[in-house]
């Protein structure tokens, strides 16, 4: 703990929201406010399911507990502690998931007609924000690893070219890392953006642990980025839907708060906020040790899975100094096509036959998300199951597709296409038309098609193949994705 104590200005042993809730619990306040379950008394089934400890602190904003929309006491203290722990100028507690963090980032820096430079393999929340604000994407289409079929990071020269050709762009957005653990050269991209008078934003939905792990890729704040969206619930241990928005010294926190309050709830969940508070404390005090163990577990799993044969659990050997500048070694991503199975097929078999739930399976890969709650015995069970799946279900792989990412042809801005007059056509009749809605596999939530992109035969083949293999498809108005909305 002494090493950690030297890293922080504030007392990271504190958890102000949690402490305030504990004080409130002892006060025995009579509730004539919302929520209507009145500390669980009005909904005994819910109380029996979640427990009195939980529903007893599902409370509304009040003076002793502060207000998320305008924090002045315990929430403000919790945000100051989070900023200190993550090396940011300011931090905001977010209760709408990292989707709300990402959208707040984009809405802070972009207005209608502004250009923003970004990779096309972004989460849908980024493109949702462009629909809302009317900004225009300047895509840096990433390279694809031919063996794995996955998109890589942005090359430095690609970003430099985009900045040179679009000098009026307001920001560059970077994935740090991608879902698969791929990192771009963030420090170099931050410098290029700043030299051109642009801000640099980082989607760090999968990079919470970068702030607390030795030997892991550089975090956005350490690289000098201006804003970063951090999914504390993914690898940091907080409750699902809780997140952080971090900002650097070049961004005005008061304006960011106004942007957040445009879309975030006025009834912030104290369950989510206290989970952020407690998890931040845990990471500040023990994060380095814990994530060192997580990285060791993932490395062990990679070695064991590769020893099985047929699978390829990839890691730092992908690094090439540019489009794969670094790799997140806690990510256990496994290529499955060489055993004749799509990633989504292995995903389904693991759940249905072995009671193992992994993060996702796509066309050619699976991802097992290792974090602070995993233990070696579960890793052993996963390795054993994969070995048995190879023995029981291996095929010759005839007819398998390999490529995850297809470069889009952009014909209109996301906002223009989303709100334009549209018509619904059978899927196969949409070739050559401009899409007006999203189509994606979820997870990972990276659009196959976004509003404003031209529909190609290759994309239609991919959609039909993904549906046939059992990928969970979301986005279109037609839930069966037999029809797509296109510009009229």
Model-based region annotation:
Residues 1-73, 444:
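N-terminal "arm"/small-domain region of PLP-dependent enzymes with the aminotransferase-like
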Residues 55-97:
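Conserved N-terminal alpha-helix of the aminotransferase class I/II PLP-enzyme fold
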Residues 137, 200-201, 358:
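Hydrophobic beta-strand scaffold residues
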Residues 148-209:
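Active-site phosphate-binding strand-loop segment of PLP-dependent enzymes
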Residues 219-258, 264-275:
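Active-site PLP attachment segment
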Residues 279-302, 378:
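Structural signature of PLP-dependent enzymes
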Residues 300-475:
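Conserved C-terminal alpha-helix-loop-beta "cap" of PLP-dependent enzymes
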């Amino acid at each position: 703990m002494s090493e950690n104590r030297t890293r922080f200005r504030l007392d990271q042993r504190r958890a102000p929201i949690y402490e305030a809730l504990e004080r409130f619990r002892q006060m025995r306040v009579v509730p004539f406010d919302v929520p209507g379950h009145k500390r669980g008394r009005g909904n005994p089934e819910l109380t029996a399911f979640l427990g009195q400890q939980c529903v007893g602190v599902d409370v509304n904003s009040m003076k002793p507990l502060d207000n998320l929309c305008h924090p002045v006491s315990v929430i403000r203290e919790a945000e100051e502690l989070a900023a200190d722990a993550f090396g940011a100028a300011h931090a905001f507690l977010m209760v709408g998931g990292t989707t709300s963090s990402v959208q707040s980032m984009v809405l802070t820096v972009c207005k209608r007609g502004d250009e923003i430079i970004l990779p096309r393999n972004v989460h849908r929340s980024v493109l949702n924000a462009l629909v809302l604000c009317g900004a225009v994407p300047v895509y840096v289409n990433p390279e694809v690893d031919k063996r794995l079929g996955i998109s890589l990071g942005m090359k430095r020269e690609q970003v430099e070219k985009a900045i040179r050709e679009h000098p009026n762009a307001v920001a560059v957005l970077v994935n740090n890392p991608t879902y698969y653990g791929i990192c771009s050269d963030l420090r170099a991209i931050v410098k290029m953006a700043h030299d051109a008078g642009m801000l640099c934003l980082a989607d760090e939905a999968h990079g919470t642990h970068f702030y607390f792990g030795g030997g892991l890729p550089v975090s956005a704040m350490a690289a000098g980025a201006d804003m970063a969206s951090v999914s504390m619930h993914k690898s940091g241990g907080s409750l699902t839907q809780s997140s952080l928005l971090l900002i650097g010294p070049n961004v005005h926190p008061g304006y960011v708060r106004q942007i957040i309050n445009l879309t975030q709830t006025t009834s912030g969940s104290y369950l989510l906020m206290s989970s952020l508070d407690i998890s931040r404390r845990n990471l500040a005090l023990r994060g380095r040790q814990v994530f060192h163990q997580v990285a060791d577990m993932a490395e062990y799993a990679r070695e064991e899975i590769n020893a099985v044969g047929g699978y390829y659990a990839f890691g730092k050997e992908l690094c090439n100094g540019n489009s794969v500048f670094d790799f997140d070694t806690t990510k256990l991503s496994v290529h499955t096509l060489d055993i004749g199975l799509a990633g989504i097929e292995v995903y389904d078999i693991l759940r249905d036959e072995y009671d193992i739930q992994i993060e996702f399976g796509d066309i050619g890969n699976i991802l097992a998300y290792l974090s602070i709650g995993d233990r070696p015995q579960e890793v052993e069970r996963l390795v054993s199951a994969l070995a048995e799946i190879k023995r029981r279900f291996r095929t010759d792989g005839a007819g398998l597709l390999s490529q995850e990412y297809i470069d889009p042809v952009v014909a209109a801005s996301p906002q223009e296409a989303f709100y334009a007059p549209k018509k619904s056509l059978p899927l196969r009749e949409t070739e050559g038309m401009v899409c007006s809605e999203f189509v994606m596999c979820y997870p990972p939530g990276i659009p196959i098609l976004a509003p404003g992109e031209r529909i190609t035969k290759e994309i239609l083949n991919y959609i039909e193949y993904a549906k046939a293999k059992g990928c969970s498809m979301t986005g279109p108005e037609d839930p069966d994705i037999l029809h797509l909305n296109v510009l009229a």
